C-alpha cells in the first residue's frame, strides 16, 4: 500500500501502534475533529505520535518520538455531539523526520521503514519461541479462558512477522522498547529484542 510522504499525527502519551495492530480511538478535541475530516476526505491515513514520557503533565510542545506506524482508518462512527469513535489499523513502519505546525493538528514528513530477513529458519524458530513465551507467561493474566483464546489467536497468525507485531502491540508497554522495536530493520534483531523483553517480565 502506498504511504504518503506526509501524515497527520495524533499525539498521545504512552501509546504506540504496530503494523497489523488495531487501535480504537475516541476523537473529541477540536483539532483532531479537523484532522479526522481531512483524513476521511483524503487517503484515510494518519499515524500515532508517541509523546515522550515525563514526570510532568503533557503539554502541546512536548516531544513526539520519531518511530511510528502509518495507520489506515478502517471504521469510523460519527456521534451526534461531534465526537467520533474509530478503528485505526497499523500498515507500515515509518520514521517521523520533520513536523509541521501549520494546521490545528501536527503533520509529519515520514520515511517508510523496510524490514529485512536474513535467516528464515531462525525467524521461524524465534516465532515459535515467542509463542511459547506468550502462552507460558501471559495466558492466565486476564481470565482462565485466556490460554485457549491466545492459542487460537497465535494459530491464526499467518507469518512470523505477524506474530512479532501481535506480541509487541499487546504485551510491550514501555515506550523505549516500542521505539527500539520499530527502529530495527532486521526481523531477527526484532525477535531477539522482544524475546529478551518478554521472557524476563
Model regions and ranges:
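N-terminal low-complexity, acidic/polar interaction/targeting segments
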Residues: 1-201
Amino acid at each position: 500500500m502506498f504511504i504518503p510522504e506526509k501524515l497527520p499525527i495524533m499525539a498521545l502519551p504512552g501509546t504506540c501502534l504496530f503494523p497489523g495492530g488495531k487501535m480504537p480511538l475516541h476523537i473529541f478535541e477540536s483539532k483532531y475533529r479537523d484532522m479526522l475530516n481531512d483524513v476521511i476526505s483524503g487517503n484515510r491515513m494518519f499515524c500515532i505520535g508517541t509523546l515522550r514520557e515525563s514526570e510532568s503533565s503533557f503539554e502541546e510542545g512536548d516531544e513526539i518520538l520519531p518511530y511510528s506506524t502509518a495507520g489506515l482508518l478502517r471504521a469510523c462512527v460519527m456521534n451526534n455531539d461531534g465526537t467520533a469513535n474509530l478503528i485505526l489499523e497499523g500498515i507500515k513502519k515509518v520514521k517521523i523526520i520533520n513536523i509541521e505546525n501549520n494546521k490545528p493538528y501536527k503533520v509529519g514528513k515520514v520515511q517508510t521503514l523496510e524490514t529485512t530477513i536474513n535467516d528464515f529458519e531462525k525467524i521461524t524458530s524465534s516465532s515459535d519461541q515467542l509463542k511459547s513465551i506468550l502462552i507460558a507467561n501471559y495466558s492466565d493474566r486476564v481470565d482462565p479462558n485466556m490460554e485457549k483464546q491466545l492459542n487460537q489467536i497465535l494459530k491464526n497468525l499467518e507469518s512470523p512477522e505477524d506474530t512479532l507485531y501481535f506480541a509487541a502491540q499487546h504485551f510491550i508497554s514501555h515506550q523505549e522498547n516500542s521505539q527500539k522495536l520499530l527502529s530495527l530493520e532486521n526481523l531477527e534483531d526484532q525477535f531477539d529484542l522482544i524475546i529478551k523483553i518478554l521472557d524476563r517480565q
